[in-house]
Amino acid sequence: MSDSHGAQQKLFDIIEMHLDDADLFIFLGDGEKDFEYATYLYPEMKYYQVAGNCDFGSELPAYDEIKFDSKTVFFSHGHPFYVKYGYSDIISEAQRRGADICLFGHTHNQHSLKQDGIYVMNPGSVREGFYGMIDIVNGHIIMIDCKI
C-alpha cells in the first residue's frame, strides 16, 4: 500500500479486508500518520513501513528490505530513486541487494511487471482506492493489482 495522503478510511477498509489472510502489510509512504493510526486500530497487524517525500519530519527509513518466505523484498517510496523518470535506478538497487521483489509508490500509477529477473510492483495510490498484493506459493511469486 502507498500514498494514502489522508484517505484513512480507504486505508482502514483495505486492512480490514485482508487482516485475517495477509501475513504482513508494507506501507510505502506518503501517509505515515494515516498508517501510524492504523497500527493503533489494528495492533495485531504485522507491518513494515518507509517514509515518502510528503512525510515531512519522518524518522522512518527511505528504504528497507526484508526476507519473507525465502524471498528478499526491497521497498521504498521511490523518490530517492527518481521513479517518476524510470525504474532503472530502483531496479539496480534491488539487484545490488539480491532482491527477488521490488516495491515502490510515489507515482500513484498502479502496475506490476517482471524486469531483469525482479518482480516489480507499484500498488498505486490508496487515496484512489488502489493497492497490491503479493502471494508466494511454492516459491512462485504472484503479483495482484487490486482496487476497492
Task: Put a short name on every predicted segment.
Residues M1-S2, L24-D30, Y48-N53, F74-H77, ...:
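Active-site neighborhood of phospho(di)ester-bond hydrolases with catalytic His/Asp-centered motifs
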Residues M1-Y42, D55-G57, P61-A62, I136-V137, ...:
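N-terminal active-site segment of His-dependent metallophosphoesterases
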Residues H5-Q9, E32-E36, C54-E59, F81-G86, ...:
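Active-site environment of divalent metal-dependent phosphoester hydrolases
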Residues F12-D13, D69, S92-G98, K114-I148:
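Binuclear metal-dependent phosphoesterase catalytic core
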Residues A22, Y63-E65, S112, Y131-M133:
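Conserved hydrophobic/aromatic beta-strand scaffold that supports enzyme active sites
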Residues E36-Y48, E93-I101:
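Short, basic/low-complexity N-terminal boundary segments at the transition from targeting/disordered tails
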Residues Y40, E44-V83:
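Helix-adjacent hinge/juxtasegments
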Residues T72-T107:
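Internal catalytic-core helix/loop-beta-alpha segment
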